[in-house]
Amino acid sequence: MAKILIFGNSGSGKSTLAQHLCKTQGLAHLDLDTLAWKLTSPPERKPIDDSEEEIKTFISSNDKWVIEGCYTDLLKIVEQQSTEIIFMNLPIESCISNAKARPWEPHKYKTKQAQDDNLAMLIDWIGQYTERNDTFSYAAHKQFYDGYHGHKKMITQNVPTEQC
């Protein structure tokens, strides 16, 4: 049974690849953005224990799944249950281009305009990927990838999803 973790910078193609795998392999999909944050303005992270409970409910309800996000602290919760990881390690310029071309994500934003209003902040966030030292950073993602002992793949450029 496929149990796949996909991670990388914002705009790296995590959701696109996850959606493709869901369609082609019949996997259940969990976007960690949907459970990592409180519904506050400005956004605030939920306690890890709350997110962990939701993740465990998801994996216990599904035999095969793909979980995607940039949160290594949350990915570690299901690392042992996964069968494969995919590190979307695209250049920052590609991530920015992808973010600019991103279709509306109604599960994250009430309107396309709200998503577009957040774009400048997102581009800045993407650009800081290699400079940050948090759970969302390149350093954290590389450490997670290097420490994983199962099947793993690193994708370093935009490619058609069929080739992933």
Where is each model-derived feature located?
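Walker A (P-loop) ATP-phosphate-binding motif of ABC ATPase nucleotide-binding domains
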Residues: 3
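Hydrophobic anchor at the beta1->P-loop junction of P-loop NTPases
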Residues: 6
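The conserved Walker
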Residues: 10
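Conserved lysine of the Walker
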Residues: 14
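Conserved substrate/cofactor phosphate-moiety recognition/catalytic segment
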Residues: 19-63
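NTP-dependent small-molecule kinase module
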Residues: 24, 128-164
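Glycine-rich phosphate-binding loop used to anchor ATP phosphates in small-molecule kinases
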Residues: 51-96
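A glycine- and Lys/Arg-enriched "phosphate-lid" helix/loop adjacent to the NTP-binding pocket
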Residues: 90-136
